[in-house]
Amino acid sequence: MTAEMNKIPEAILSLEHASNDRWNRGDYHGFLESYTKDVTYFDPLTERLLVGRQAVEEHFEKFYKGVDVARSEYLNEHVILSEGRDLAVLSYNLRNYVVDEKHAEKRSAAWNSSEVYRLLDGRWRILHSHWSLTRHPAIVAKRAV
């Protein structure tokens, strides 16, 4: 990979981290600003594919307003770049930590994330976003029995 191509994954990771930092402070607009107008979106709370920034914003407002995450850990970050260098797929695992009532940090949700970015008018934008739980509680509970 050339030095120029190395800058693209760094730029995408920087955008993703900045959006997630805002999310952790209860501001989901960082992600909304990164989405294209016709973004497609899934997460564990969606019953169907959400299409369009407006639909995603309504979903965020309903389920994620006021999120408060103390910190996040990014694991297994991987960016695949198209030959044309205008399309990239970012995949990673995210561990979130919150502060409990005793002011102790504890692990919260663990996520799988896949984001499809496209370079549009000189700016990397998210075309598709898919979030899932890393280890779904129902599946983990069945295995523990």
Predicted regions and their residues:
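A beta-strand edge to alpha-helix "cap/lid" segment located at domain peripheries
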Residues: T2-E33, T40-V145
